[in-house]
């Protein structure tokens, strides 16, 4: 997408790779919306930490980051023996896989890279194939999101108020996004609408990232408290809900997404509001048979017990926000916290799943698995 930096529009991707210094290039999302910065991560362990620490986050973005990280780790190997290289690659794979356990995109992305590497007969050949496959995954992610936009745009009519949760925009993918893709496509087709962004505590990705994206795209929006969605639905001020997913079960249609998604689905169902989930094919898990089998990441208590931000009086001129983002304890100083990062929404609460191949009912996914890149 195009980003306005110091008054100039610059096109950039959330994730990219610099082959010259074997570094993964990431937008430092923890600084947004107050500062735009691209960081270079130069080894696979650092790339795994960037995923875990949420320098980069979002299903497609961490999938592409893991794919590049696997290629990065492969390219860092200096030996010539394939047996030693295979052991090294296993270490790289497991390190990246364990960075964020709930999302399935990193595993699918790395499996795609490893499958491509098998045709190489030497270490250098496999290293080259790894980077080519990672680039292919990243480009495919963009293509999938563009297709999601085209399929989902017709759901949006002029005058609508749309609710979204967390950030499933271009920052959560390589470009374009999933939940935002229909919005961007509808905007390009001339439709005018308004978006409510849940703040999405505790990391506030809706208030910081989605709101920043929509402002960049000049789409009218308001940030709302997480608990305000029910009130707005009750008053008839929300017409449509579109969210993303970190893992969607192809066998059942259940959806794991940022904590609070299930709550919004229950509210939408109660008020008869269509609730859609937008996903690329890499987000589909064809193996698990129940949402209760999805590993739910539990993050640090500090995320719930405090908040990040900048002083309200800080100047807004270029560069003035640097190093101003700070953490403040909000909760009672002796209280602990529980911090599940995700929840699971059952299929019966979901109106449809927007995919690159079209829109399907959640329980249709298994029957359409060949069309959606699933098993035979």
Labelled PLM ranges:
Residues 38-44, 169-173, 250-256:
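Short, glycine-rich nucleotide/cofactor-binding loops
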Residues 25, 31, 37-47, 77-95, ...:
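PLP-dependent amino-acid enzyme catalytic core
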Residues 192-193, 198-376:
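Conserved phosphate- and dinucleotide-binding cores of soluble alpha/beta proteins
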Residues 39-55, 154-162, 246, 323-336:
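Short, hydrophobic/aliphatic alpha-helical segments
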Residues 27, 65, 69, 163-167, ...:
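Short beta-strand segments
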Residues 31-33, 70, 169-170, 247-250:
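A short, flexible beta-alpha/helix-coil linker loop
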Residues 1-45, 52:
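Positively charged, low-complexity intrinsically disordered leader regions
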Residues 53-224:
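N-terminal active-site beta-alpha-beta segment that forms phosphate/nucleotide-binding
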């Amino acid at each position: 997408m195009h980003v306005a930096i110091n008054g100039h529009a610059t096109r950039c991707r959330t994730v990219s790779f610099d082959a010259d210094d074997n570094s993964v290039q990431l937008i430092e999302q923890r600084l947004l919306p107050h500062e735009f910065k691209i960081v270079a991560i130069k080894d696979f362990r650092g790339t795994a930490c960037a995923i875990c620490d949420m320098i980069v986050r979002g299903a497609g973005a961490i999938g592409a980051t893991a794919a590049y990280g696997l290629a990065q780790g492969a390219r860092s190997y200096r030996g010539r023996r394939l047996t030693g290289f295979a052991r090294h690659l296993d270490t790289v794979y497991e390190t990246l896989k364990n960075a964020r356990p709930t999302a399935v995109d990193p595993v699918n992305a790395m499996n795609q890279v490893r499958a491509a590497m098998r045709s190489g007969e030497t270490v250098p050949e496999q290293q080259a194939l790894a980077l080519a496959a990672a680039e292919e995954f990243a480009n495919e992610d963009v293509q999938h999101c563009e297709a999601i936009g085209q399929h989902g745009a017709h759901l949006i009519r002029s005058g609508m108020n749309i609710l979204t949760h967390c950030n499933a925009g271009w920052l959560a993918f390589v470009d374009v996004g999933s939940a935002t893709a229909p919005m961007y496509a509808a905007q390009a087709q001339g439709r005018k609408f308004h978006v409510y962004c849940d703040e999405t505590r505790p990391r506030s990705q809706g208030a910081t990232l989605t709101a920043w994206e929509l402002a960049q795209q000049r789409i009218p929006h308001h940030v709302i408290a997480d608990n305000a969605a029910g009130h707005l639905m009750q008053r008839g001020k929300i017409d449509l809900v579109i969210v993303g997913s970190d893992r969607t079960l192809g066998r059942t249609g259940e959806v794991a997404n940022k904590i609070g998604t299930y709550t919004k689905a229950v509210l939408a169902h109660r008020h008869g509001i269509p609730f859609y989930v937008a996903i690329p094919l890499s987000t589909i898990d064809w193996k698990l048979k129940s949402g209760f089998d999805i590993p739910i990441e539990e993050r640090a208590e500090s995320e719930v017990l405090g908040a990040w931000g900048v002083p309200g009086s800080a100047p807004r001129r270029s560069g003035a926000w640097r190093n101003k983002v700070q953490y403040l304890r909000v909760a009672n100083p002796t209280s602990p916290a529980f911090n599940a990062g995700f929840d699971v929404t059952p299929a019966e609460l979901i109106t449809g799943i927007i995919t690159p191949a079209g829109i399907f009912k959640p329980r249709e996914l298994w029957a359409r698995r060949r069309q959606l890149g699933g098993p035979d």
